[in-house]
């Protein structure tokens, strides 16, 4: 009788990772930090799985971090860091090398694209970075999404920055 009960209990196949209202978190972070936090528009079927403000981290670089998940479980993380110093940036990018620079059509913003050297069996989230600096601040995108997905997200970020 116990076996029959176990077999008829429906299984929940939904994602166990909650969707986060990253826009609300960004608004709260902007209000508390007095920094211009960016909450880019997402493409259809993309959602956020985490968003947080690190106002007083050990490395002394305050930042907003948000993760985005695509319809096929692609992942792109975004770090918007304030008061970035060369050491912090070098440590963050220590496992990747500069591959090329990229600018969206008509944009003044230059994204430095970094990639991990070949050899990893499985792609890791921090094997691929797009980085731009604006004054003493930086925006870093990283993850397993395609180059086209990174390009689209970078365009959406630039739209929030007011860069055309």
Q: Predicted segment positions?
A:
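Ser/Thr/Pro/Gly-rich low-complexity linker/stalk segments immediately outside membranes or between
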Residues: 12-25
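Hydrophobic membrane-insertion alpha-helices, especially the h-region
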Residues: 1-10
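Short, solvent-exposed recognition patches
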Residues: 24-124
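Alpha-helix boundary/capping residues
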Residues: 11, 95-96, 157-160
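Generic surface-pattern signal
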Residues: 9, 30-35, 159-162
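A short, solvent-exposed beta-edge/loop patch
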Residues: 6, 100-164
């Amino acid at each position: 009788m116990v076996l029959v009960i176990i077999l008829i209990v429906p299984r929940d196949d939904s994602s166990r990772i909650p969707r986060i209202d990253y826009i609300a978190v960004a608004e709260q972070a902007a209000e508390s930090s007095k920094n211009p936090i960016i909450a880019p528009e997402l493409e259809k079927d993309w959602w956020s799985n985490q968003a947080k403000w690190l106002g007083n981290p050990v490395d002394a670089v305050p930042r907003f971090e948000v993760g985005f998940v695509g319809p096929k479980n692609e992942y792109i993380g975004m770090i918007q860091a304030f008061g970035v110093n060369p050491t912090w940036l070098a440590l963050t990018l220590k496992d990747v090398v500069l591959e090329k620079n990229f600018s969206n059509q008509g944009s003044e913003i230059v994204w430095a694209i970094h990639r991990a050297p070949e050899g990893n069996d499985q792609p890791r989230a921090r094997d691929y970075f797009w980085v731009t600096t604006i004054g003493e601040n930086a925006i870093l995108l990283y993850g397993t999404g395609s180059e086209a997905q990174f390009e689209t997200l970078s365009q959406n970020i630039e739209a929030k920055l007011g860069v055309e």
